[in-house]
Each structure stands twice: as structure tokens, then as C-alpha cells.
Amino acid sequence: MRNLLEQIQGRLDELNKAERKVAEVILLNPQQATRFSIAALAQAAKVSEPTVNRFCRSFGVSGYPELKLQLAQSLASGAAYVSRAVEADDDPAAYTQKIFASAIASLDSACQQLDPQQVSRAVDMMIQARQIHFFGLGASAPVALDAQHKFFRFNLAVSAHADVLMQRMLASVAHTGDLFVIISYTGRTRELVEVARLARENGASVLGLTAAGSPLANACSLSLHIPLPEDTDIYMPMTSRIIQLTVLDVLATGMTLRRGVDFQPHLRKIKESLNASRYPIEDDDLN
């Protein structure tokens, strides 16, 4: 179950303008928010005190005192994702620490919320597939390419595509036995949702790596719901790709274990095929 900070971060887009101001003040400095009075929070967010109370009730708490208690519990858990935005005056030490802390906390949060039964079902879909297409757009496009690099090792027909027209054409000729893995941070990209629906209409299975409750998640046969809180207003998504790549590693590991020890020589052969393309470590010419 997500803690309060994660719930606030995940619902930012659902809040009205005034309530979002309250959320942004809390996420900017949750420690300080636990020390605010309701009047101080309202002033910091430039909203009225009744707006703060409505915000509290929308998250299932009776008022600001209870909200502050849950905030403190979220911070004390040690696993909460706390938004720490990079500021214009951050020095290298500050922004380095923030980026690493954000990635570590987001990975921990994703691990806790990833359903093992859903992971097992996703691995089943991949093992049973005749061929797998990985789709991604924007920041998720290189993740799809990385997936192709991982999963061709399983003696499957695997492809990756970041062009919306190619994605649509492949979905239009999909068949039973085809699996489309669609990767999207928001799950709200119209083209990807349409492709998911088209592929399913033609008998294919669709696995989504995306946000819970999103249009894409609802359009897929199965969706691995990945919480990806991050700063997206100014900076390009960073932690989203790290989590997506890690989840794909989880699925690849699941497939490897399902194939058993008899499959290991095949993987070893692929790895050893690269030896001739690399300089030996002890080569003096490289010193």
C-alpha cells in the first residue's frame, strides 16, 4: 500500500488547481509541512484554509492534524519517495545526491508495489508468445530497444519499434500468439493506447509497463503497474527509465529461471561469442 507522500505524488494530475498548490507545497518540503499550522500551509500555498481541509478529506483523513501525522509516518518509514526538486542554485554535490537519492527511493517504492503474481503472469505471457514486439515512444523508446537486446537471447522472434506508424501497422496484422509489450511512463499517450486496442482486437496479447489506472493500463491484457514519481515539468524523465529497465530485468530473469539449467549453455554461448570482439584486459597496448 502506498504511503501518503506517494499517494499525493501519484494524484497530482487529478487535483484541482487550488488543491494542487497544497500538494506541491507539501511535496517540496514534507518535513516542513509536518511543522506547519493549517494557516501557515494555506499561506504558503496561497489558498484558503477550507481548501486545505478539502485537500485533507480527499486523501481520506479528517483534517490537517491527521494529515501531518501520516506525513510524519511516511517520512519515518525510510522508504517513502520524497520529491526533492533540483534547484537552479544546486552545486554538483547537491544535484548528484538528489538524483541518486531519487532513483534509489523510486526503485525501492516500485519493488514494494510490484505484484509478484502479476510478474509471474507476465512471464507466462512471454514464454507462450510466438513473437514479441516492444513498443515505446519518447523517453521509453530506448527502453524498448534495450528489451530487444535482452529478449532475443530466448530464441524468440523479438523486435522493438519507436515509430508510431510502424507500431500501428504491426498491430493491424497481429495474430493470436503475438505479444505486444507497450512501455509508457504516463500511460496516456493516445497513439499507444490505440495500438494496444488494435492489437487485442486482432487476437494478440498486450502487456503494459505503465501507470496504474491509466488509459493504457486499461487497454492491456495485463499491466504491471509501476509507480514513477518524478519531476517532469522541467527535466526529462530519469527515474522512469531506470525502473522500466529494472522491471524488464525482472522479467528476463523470470524467463531464464523458467527455462531451467538446460538453457544456460545457450546463454553462455551468446556471451562468449563477444570475447573475440574485445581487447584482452591484460593487453599492454591499452595501458
From Swiss-Prot:
Superkingdom in the source lineage: Bacteria
SUPFAM superfamilies xref list: Homeodomain-like, SIS domain
Molecular function GO terms recorded: carbohydrate derivative binding; DNA-binding transcription repressor activity; transcription cis-regulatory region binding
Pfam families membership: HTH_6, SIS
Annotated Gene Ontology cellular component terms: protein-DNA complex
A GO BP annotation: carbohydrate derivative metabolic process
Keywords on record: DNA-binding, Repressor, Transcription, Transcription regulation
DNA-binding region(s), residue ranges: 38-57
Limits of the SIS domain: 122-261
Domain HTH rpiR-type: 2-78
Activity regulation information from UniProt: Binding of 2-keto-3-deoxy-6-phosphogluconate (KDPG) to HexR releases the repressor from its target sequences.
Gene3D superfamilies attached to this UniProt entry: Glucose-6-phosphate isomerase like protein, domain 1, Winged helix-like DNA-binding domain superfamily/Winged helix DNA-binding domain
Summary of the function given for this chain in its UniProt record: Involved in regulation of glucose metabolism. Transcriptional repressor of the gap-1 gene and of the edd-glk-gltR-2 and zwf-pgl-eda operons. Acts by binding directly to an inverted pseudopalindromic sequence in the promoter region.
Oligomeric and partner information: Monomer in solution. Binds DNA as a dimer.
Name listed for the protein in its UniProt record: HTH-type transcriptional regulator HexR
